[in-house]
UniProtKB/Swiss-Prot annotation:
Family: Belongs to the class-I aminoacyl-tRNA synthetase family. IleS type 2 subfamily.
Record-given protein name: Isoleucine--tRNA ligase
Molecular-function GO terms, alphabetical: aminoacyl-tRNA deacylase activity; ATP binding; isoleucine-tRNA ligase activity; tRNA binding; zinc ion binding
Quaternary structure annotation from Swiss-Prot or TrEMBL: Monomer.
Gene: ileS
Length: 1108
């Protein structure tokens, strides 16, 4: 007989953080990550795109969540036999880097940067952008995520930037680019426009209180006979028909309107003036007003106040009752908005009073009733709708606000004032002029800069645009080729965004970014535009060697304008750089330096098989990838995409350093291990796009450790402890005929198959559930029911079969779940493969780093996924044993609810079912597990219980709201029937998810519970006889002795002496107690351990001693 211990000594109270660090070191020392790629050389590839983060900040829980998901599928596809390269990447350009540099340099704004020097500023950006790269690698490595940092790409690398230039020129050549002056979301804090989709990113909108003002505009429309035909409500005694020339309408900006009876609208004796009321939340745009808009079909009321008649949407009159001095019983003349079209009004201010074609009322389909007056003031330099409407009427925009959001000299009395700071001064001026009617506090969601958290403005700026609207229908078509998780993203969140896509502004008037490769003539008399798509083209035209594509080096490239015969004009680059989202969207080809290098590689690695980020990236990275992929290649950029949700604190607030509402992830890793955090995140609904609330103290992670990781480890600990004690080595074996072995091996195949199916469909939640469900059965059924096989002293075939089966379960599951819990799986796998030393002490296993040298499967992550063809499933046995397990679980529930402890034997259990014949072969098992003396079988279910209908009211109420009252009444009366498997109530057939049938025992029956999906009933006899009570005490003695053995730190194989003074029990049940505890009863020995216990209302001493 050998005394070899084949497995390491495993503690039941393992320090998982320490174990994980040992595994991480093992991976590093043995280059396991690279081996996992190398062994798949020549195999099919799984293409994975790793979205580039910024490295100028530390990783947060959102990054870790995304990283966990990426790692799961990369590892899973590897064990499925595919080669998975995982090249890391870094976003380097854009506002995050610039804002950080401005802060560190103590400067702010375009002028300050220019004075500081663009070269020095960009050099600082280059140095600081990778500030936390080392910390990123530490976090990513500690979370057990495998990525290739050594060959990482950076968007600031010359090769990447050149691919971006190529993409731009391709779009230009396809006619998909244009330059225009358009109103865009504008960050005055960053002095740059933002894309429309950037205002849709998470938390871009904040609740904000603004002063909303209502102002009056004086009508001064000249009237002719034809005008009266169109606007009959003006005909109240016209003094004179005059020439239809709105230019004669004039107004002093401070004084009252002046009227010339020979040239201006005659006003009846009833009204001195007509004033139309407009409401706005952007008071600062009023100095730039050039028009008003009304709704053609909206009703407008003529509301008199003294000798002035106000025009306002009829639905808004009541909101201005105080200001218009209404009593509540007035009747007003009502006109349609269409009757206001074409009227002129006097400018509020004289800043642009001579602006052509301005100061008229037009119809706009964007005008709606609700907030305000039903009249929208138009400032085409500061509103998208305003610009579109005004341009259609021949009104050119004005924009008297500079890049920093301050008024220019065009508004002399507000020059240099920040627009939001000008609101109060403008209101004062309106009051002085008599145009003010009302100011109110208006609380609304307003877009803010995603980098500076300052409120945006909408402002006309020159920019280059991608004509997304020209091919958005094609994007919608290509989107149908993508598998989205969750599925509703395809046609809702992402699909509807694509349907409503706008042209994309891709230029930014900033400094640190890939420069737009556009050169223009500096003389408009000889216009010319050159667009470059490669370094070679630049070097050819400018005759210099290009070593850096950044500003200011690229700005210094000039040449004579070839189209200027005088030779005096020069081609100069426009100052703009790319929107950094354009660079992110260029990642698939940028990382490969396509098309200048790796052309075949790119074509074989595009599109990606898989991509993942949080849901807001449907407006960000996913979107820009889609735009550029469609425009350049007419293909979707990826085939499978997970949109996960966001992580919030326990109260639902965003995780924030300022709020101090989350723990440093590294602290959690050191406390509970990263596998526990991985399971916590990826088993939740956050992977399905929902929110995950996580507490600062890590209780959720601890619960995962306790409820998910520990059961896995407990099974491994049990195996190694008993296998070492018996000096038995387990082997893979799928052919045992023992009924428990066949059952657990069948359940093993079901679990492994479920994990595979789940991960194939990108569903980690179901995969984790399959793991947890299997180990629940393995620990609490198979191991517990097989203890006698492990404990018996003879090493027969049955004992070896039990070890082989448990070994097979552990090794197979270690491989199957290796992507889900990579560190713990590795620890278990390595432990199972631990061989004895060839020399030295055979009792001690080899060290972690050396014991597997020369083994092909050096790591669980180098294995192939379990071959399901090796497994056989006995479906009938599984169904029956699952029912047995269901019976036992419900019996335990009854015991718990009736305060009948498990160790207390009961006389009988009655099983009332139509499938009793299959259960009878497991009668001894049921009796032993439930701790009853007999099993009674019956099939007359109707004598013991009745079926009740339970309706899913929220679900059914959506489908049949009108019938719910009748259905509820009928369900209470049991007026329903099941026909051909369908439930019918009130002549309606219910869907399976709209109801449940509950088996309800008759009220006089105690100790009863339904099982087998409410198809059967069991009843425990809870009456206790003296004999049953005594046997229960004997079983309690066994428990106390076992606990004493544990407290005394005895080995499981140690035999002991026992001294307890309870002869009434020990005389009858002595043999049972000795057998269960490896003990003998004795007196007068010196104990190794003494316990004070209470049994049968008596306090006793329990003494035990280990026998040498």
């Amino acid at each position: 007989m050998t005394n070899t211990k084949y497995y390491p000594e495993v503690s039941s109270n393992a320090d998982f953080a320490t174990i994980e660090k040992e595994i991480l070191k093992f991976w590093q020392d043995n280059n396991i990550f690279q081996k996992s790629i190398d062994i798949r050389e020549g195999d099919a590839e799984f293409i994975f795109y790793d979205g580039p983060p910024f490295a100028n900040g530390l990783p947060h829980y959102g990054h870790l969540l995304t990283g966990f998901i990426k790692d799961v599928y990369a590892r899973y596809q590897t064990v499925r036999g595919k080669k998975v390269e995982r090249r890391f990447g870094w976003d380097c350009h854009g506002l995050p880097a610039e804002m950080q540099s401005e802060k560190e340099l103590g400067i702010s704004g375009h002028l300050a940067i220019t004075n500081f020097g663009i070269e020095k500023f960009n050099a600082h950006c280059r140095d600081s952008v990778m500030k936390y790269a080392g910390e990123w690698e530490q976090y990513v490595t500690r979370q057990a995520r495998w990525v290739d940092f050594k060959n990482s790409y950076k968007t600031m690398d010359k090769n990447f930037m050149e691919s971006v230039l190529w993409a731009f020129k391709e779009l230009y050549n396809k006619g998909l680019l244009y330059e225009s002056m358009r109103v865009m979301p504008y960050s005055w804090a960053c002095e740059t426009p933002l894309s429309n989709f950037e205002t849709r990113l998470d938390n871009s909108y904040r609740e904000r209180a603004d002063k909303a003002v209502t102002v009056s505009f004086v009508l001064c429309h000249p009237v002719s006979k034809s005008t009266l035909d169109v606007i009959p409500w003006l005909d109240h005694g016209i003094q004179k028909t005059i020439n239809n020339d709105s230019a004669n309408c004039s107004m002093d900006p401070v004084d009252k309107p002046r009227y010339d009876t020979e040239n201006f609208l005659g006003i009846t004796a009833n009204y001195k003036e007509y004033r139309i009321l407009a409401w706005t939340t952007t008071t600062w745009t009023l100095p730039s007003n050039l028009a008003l808009a009304v709704g053609s079909d909206i009703d407008y009321a003529l509301v008199p106040k003294g000798d002035v008649c106000y025009i306002i949407a009829a639905s808004s009159v009541s909101k201005y009752a105080k200001e218009l001095e209404l009593k509540g019983d007035e009747q007003f003349t009502i006109i349609k908005g269409s009757e206001l079209q074409g009227l002129s009004y006097k400018p509020l201010f004289d800043y642009f009073k001579n602006h052509p074609n301005s100061f008229k009322i037009f119809a706009g389909d964007f005008v709606v009733e609700g907030d305000g007056t039903g009249v929208v003031h138009m400032a085409p330099g500061f509103g998208e709708d305003d610009q579109i409407l005004c341009e259609s009427k021949g009104i050119k925009l004005v924009c008297p606000v500079d890049n920093s959001g301050k008024f220019t000299k065009e508004i002399p009395d507000l020059e240099g004032l920040q627009v939001f700071d000008a609101n109060d001064k403008i209101i004062i001026k309106l009051k002085e002029q008599g145009n003010w009617l009302k100011t109110e506090q208006y609380i609304h969601n307003y877009p803010h800069c995603w980098r500076t958290d300052t409120p945006l403005i909408y402002k006309a700026v020159p920019s280059w645009y991608v004509k997304v609207t020209e091919f958005k229908d094609r994007m919608v078509e290509l989107n149908q080729q993508i598998n989205w998780i969750p599925t509703h993203v395809k046609d809702n969140l992402f699909g509807k965004w694509l349907e409503n896509a706008r042209d994309w502004s891709i230029s930014r008037n900033r400094f640190w970014g890939t420069p737009l490769p556009v050169w223009k003539s500096d003389d408009p008399k000889y216009p010319r535009i050159d667009v470059y798509g490669s370094i070679e083209e630049l070097e050819k035209d400018f005759g210099v060697k290009i070593t850096d594509l950044h500003r200011p080096f690229i700005d210094e490239l000039t040449r004579a304008n070839p189209d200027d015969p005088t030779g005096k004009s020069t081609m100069r680059r426009i100052e703009d750089v790319f929107d950094c989202w354009f660079e992110s969207g260029s990642m698939p080809y940028g990382q490969a330096h396509y098309p200048f290098e790796n052309k075949q590689w790119f074509e074989e690695h595009f599109p990606a098989d898989f991509i993942v980020e949080y849901s807001a990236q449907t407006r960000g990275w996913f979107y820009t990838l889609m735009v550029l992929s469609t425009a350049l290649f007419d293909r979707p950029p990826f085939l499978n995409c997970i949109c996960h949700g966001v992580i919030l604190d326990a109260t639902g607030q965003k995780l924030s350093k300022r709020l101090n509402n989350y723990a440093d992830p590294l602290e959690l890793f050191d406390k509970y291990g990263s596998d526990a955090l991985r399971v916590t995140m990826l088993s939740s609904n956050v992977v399905k796009g929902q929110e995950l609330l996580i507490d600062k103290d890590g209780k959720m992670v601890f619960d995962t450790l306790r409820l998910f990781i520990k059961p896995i480890w407990n099974a491994y600990h049990f195996f190694t402890m008993y296998a070492n004690a018996d000096h038995i080595k387990g082997e893979l074996n799928f052919t045992s005929e023992n009924v428990l072995d066949v059952y657990i091996l069948s359940k093993l195949k079901i679990a492994v198959e479920k994990i595979k199916e789940s991960l194939d469909s990108f569903d980690t939640g179901t995969a984790y559930h399959a793991v947890s469900e299997f180990f629940e059965v393995l620990n609490n059924w198979y191991i517990r029911r097989s203890r006698a096989r492990f404990w018996k002293s003879e090493k027969d075939a049955d004992k070896q079969s039990a070890y082989n089966t448990l070994y097979t379960c552990l090794e197979t599951m270690a491989i199957a779940m290796s992507s889900l819990v990579p560190l713990i799986s590795e620890a278990i796998y390595l432990g199972l493969y631990c061989h004895p030393r060839k020399s030295g002490d055979p009792e001690k296993p080899e060290c972690l780093d050396s014991r597997l040298c020369g083994n092909d499967n050096l790591s669980v992550h180098l294995c192939d996924y379990p071959d399901l063809s090796k497994f056989k499933i006995n479906s009938e046995l599984v169904d029956t044993m699952d029912t047995v397990l269901d019976i036992c679980n419900h019996s335990l529930f009854i015991r718990s609810s009736e305060n009948a402890r498990v160790r207390q034997p009961l006389s009988s259990i009655t099983i009332i079912s139509k499938n009793n014949d299959k259960l009878k072969s497991f009668e001894d098992l049921i009796k032993d597990e439930i701790n009853v003396k007999s099993v009674i079988y019956r099939d007359d279910l109707e004598n013991y219980a009745v079926k009740k209908l339970s309706i899913n009211f929220p679900l059914l109420g959506k489908r049949l709201p009108a019938k719910m009252k009748d259905i509820i009444a009928a369900s209470k009366k049991n007026e329903w029937e099941v026909t051909s498997g369908s439930l019918i109530i009130c002549n309606e057939t219910l869907n399976s998810d709209e109801y449940k049938l509950i088996l309800e025992p008759h009220s006089h029956i105690k100790g009863a519970s339904s099982f087998a999906h409410n198809s059967s009933l069991l009843i425990l006899d809870l009456e206790l006889t003296p004999e049953l009570i005594d046997e229960g005490i004997a079983r309690d003695i066994v428990r106390f002795i076992q606990q004493a053995r544990k407290n005394a730190d005895f080995a499981i194989t140690d035999r002991i002496l026992i001294d307890i003074n309870l002869p009434k029990i020990t005389d009858i049940y002595g043999e049972f107690i000795k057998e269960q505890t490896l003990g003998k009863f004795a007196k007068d020995f010196i104990p190794d351990h003494i316990s004070e216990i209470e049994l049968d209302n008596h306090k006793l001493q329990l003494k035990i001693k280990k026998v040498n």
